[in-house]
Amino acid sequence: MTIVWAVLAFALMILLHEGGHFTAAKLCGVRVDEFALGLGPVLLKKKAGETTYALRALPFGGQCVMGEDDETDTDPRAFLNAAAWKRAVILAAGVTMNFLMGFVVLLCLYAPAQGFVTPTIDAFMEKFTGGGETGLRPGDTILEVDGYNVYLSTDISTALAKGRDAYYDIWLVRDGEKLHLENVYIAPQEYELNGETVEYYGFYLRAEPATAGVKLRVTWYSCVNVVRLVIESLK
């Protein structure tokens, strides 16, 4: 049953992706020859206007055919003959639909949440190294660590893990004022937890109630972080 749900989810993702191309093409006045869900032999098809709608045997792909492979097509409504901005919009529409799908799925997953951890310092553990007069203080909201933007609480540990050493340049908000701290020493320390030795950076973060606005914000930045991760993986 798990495989069936996985196939259906993948088919939905493809449908939304190709549907994004299709909708953008129609809105831009670009000719769509075929809109198909699936690959391989045709199971069902129907032509409406200039477009053939088809369901194919293998639910592992799809296509929105706009004459993009025919360089000899002289129709001004063919994809290759459309204005550059129209082609850009059509190409971007597929990815945009997948992003929106991910946003909706995450929002549904976050819906039951009662609260979220924020990037605001609440307190320090005994061995925390980054406090003091020139370091972090309880109530500080972290904005950036070594150039890495902090949107969610998890971004702090990600940014700290990226550091080549334990000294960080940090932008934060303290008492409503934006501050820049240089060379803040934050190194993981060993702590005893339930009889085991574990490493922590040594600070606690505050939580906030999961209001509708907070859920939307956390969902948005979760999607942004996925995009950021993909971009970084390509570097």
Feature-to-residue mapping (PLM):
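Short N-terminal helix-initiation segments at or just after the protein's N-terminus
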Residues: 1-5, 114-117
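Residue-level signature of transmembrane alpha-helical entry/exit and packing/kink sites
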Residues: 2, 6, 82-91, 95
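Small-residue-rich helix-interface/hinge motifs
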Residues: 2-74
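Alpha-helical transmembrane spans of integral membrane proteins, capturing the lipid-embedded, hydrophobic core
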Residues: 7-14, 91, 95, 99, ...
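Hydrophobic alpha-helical segments
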Residues: 8, 22, 91, 220-222
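PDZ peptide-recognition modules
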Residues: 70-85, 97-235
